[in-house]
């Protein structure tokens, strides 16, 4: 099933039970929850969204299990400073969700990047992700070309999403 673009976030309402099989509402809520967790930049917190034996492919790196996820994210956020991420539901079916995303960050030399990508997720019966496949491309940008300007942490509900920003 394909997702409808521009779905409004309803973070002020109670979250439905986010387990498969996903509906449009639960898939979109799952995507926003993942975005919020990643924007925390807390590797331990993020890792809890994945099974202890989770399998990832992130670019050309293979990551297996929560311990490796924590180590991977710790390295990532030491390099990718002032990281801000937007995820958008692309498609869903059963226990699978496809997402497109963009994030902005800079390195320790002050060089800014916007990274674009797609993720394919598969969840266990408890709604915990056990497979994550990510393809990512990096685009150098000028600081003046940044589009993600909220304070570090959770993206505000009124901040535009990827489609709204024309990305």
Predicted regions and their residues:
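A beta-strand edge to alpha-helix "cap/lid" segment located at domain peripheries
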Residues: 2-22, 71-167
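Short, flexible active-site loop motifs that bind/organize anionic cofactors or intermediates
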Residues: 17, 36, 59
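Short, aromatic-enriched amphipathic alpha-helices that serve as compact interaction elements
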Residues: 23-40
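A solvent-exposed, acidic/Ser-Thr-rich amphipathic alpha-helical stretch
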Residues: 26-29, 43-97
């Amino acid at each position: 099933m394909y997702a409808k673009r521009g779905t409004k976030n309803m973070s002020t309402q109670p979250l439905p039970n986010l387990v498969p099989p996903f509906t449009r509402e639960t898939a979109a809520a799952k995507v926003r929850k993942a975005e919020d967790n990643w924007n925390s930049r807390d590797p331990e917190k993020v890792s809890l969204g994945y099974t202890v034996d989770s399998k990832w492919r992130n670019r050309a790196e293979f990551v297996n299990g929560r311990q490796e996820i924590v180590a991977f994210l710790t390295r990532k956020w030491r390099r990718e400073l002032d990281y801000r991420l937007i995820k958008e539901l692309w498609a869903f079916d059963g226990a699978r969700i496809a997402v497109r995303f963009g994030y902005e960050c800079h390195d320790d030399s002050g060089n800014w990047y916007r990274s674009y990508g797609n993720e394919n997720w598969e969840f266990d019966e408890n709604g915990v992700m056990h497979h994550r496949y990510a393809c990512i491309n990096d685009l150098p940008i000028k600081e003046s070309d940044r589009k993600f300007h909220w304070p570090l942490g959770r993206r505000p509900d009124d901040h535009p999403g990827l489609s709204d920003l024309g990305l």
